Amino acid sequence: MKMIIQIFFIISLISTISFASVQDFCVADPKGPQSPSGYSCKNPDQVTENDFAFTGLGTAGNTSNIIKAAVTPAFAPAYAGINGLGVSLARLDLAGGGVIPLHTHPGASEVLVVIQGTICAGFISSANKVYLKTLNRGDSMVFPQGLLHFQLNSGKGPALAFVAFGSSSPGLQILPFALFANDLPSELVEATTFLSDAEVKKLKGVLGGTN
């Protein structure tokens, strides 16, 4: 319980500009138009307490996949009540050897809190300096907006962490999938990554890319 309180305290700190300063809330209406500031607002007369609650973070994600990890997001519009409030969160489950590969959130900074296990986490600055830290239960680390970062289970058992973001829709781009899980011609991938034809085709084969 103390750990959960810490997580939500962090969430309350990472948002400095809130839609709620204009009106009480703007529950996401997924059927309406979306703008850079978020989803359009649901009719207040149709808003219920269920819009402000999310129950999906208590269940472990399925880590039976190539990265041996799972992310359970609580973003808008799935978590409708956080729309426009400048916060969101997610659950990270990592089996032994599991990894959240190098990725970036273009729309928000991220704070991670380790609940179980040991996680090696780090990010790379725009000057290509690496900031790397081994985190244990109760430890936290912040990842600045837009910078490449990762989380790796470096312990002997499963690892669990919760992350909070300074946006209700932080966005996500995972570098290996962006490079090799698409239909960009292999010769262009080779030219822009300095990898060989065999290496590119191997990675595309593993991650589902074509061409």
Swiss-Prot record:
Glycosylation sites: 62
GO CC annotation: apoplast; extracellular matrix; nucleus; plastid; secretory vesicle
SUPFAM superfamilies: RmlC-like cupins
Molecular functions per Gene Ontology: manganese ion binding
Major site of localization recorded for this protein: secreted
Residues that bear Phosphoserine: 140
InterPro entries in the record: Cupin_1 (IPR006045), Germin (IPR001929), Germin_Mn-BS (IPR019780), RmlC-like_jellyroll (IPR014710), RmlC_Cupin_sf (IPR011051)
Similarity field: Belongs to the germin family.
Keyword terms, alphabetized: Apoplast, Disulfide bond, Glycoprotein, Manganese, Metal-binding, Phosphoprotein, Secreted, Signal
Described purpose of this protein according to its UniProt entry: May play a role in plant defense. Probably has no oxalate oxidase activity even if the active site is conserved.
Signal peptide: 1-20
Listed name of the protein: Germin-like protein subfamily 3 member 3
Taxonomic superkingdom: Eukaryota
Source organism of this protein record: Arabidopsis thaliana (Mouse-ear cress)
Expression tissues: Expressed in leaves and flowers.
Disulfide bridge partners, by residue number: 26-41
PROSITE patterns found in the cross-reference section: GERMIN (PS00725)
Pfam families to which the protein is assigned, alphabetical: Cupin_1
Localization per Swiss-Prot or TrEMBL: Secreted, Extracellular space, Apoplast
Domain Cupin type-1: 55-201
Induction context: Expressed with a circadian rhythm, with peak expression at the beginning of the night.
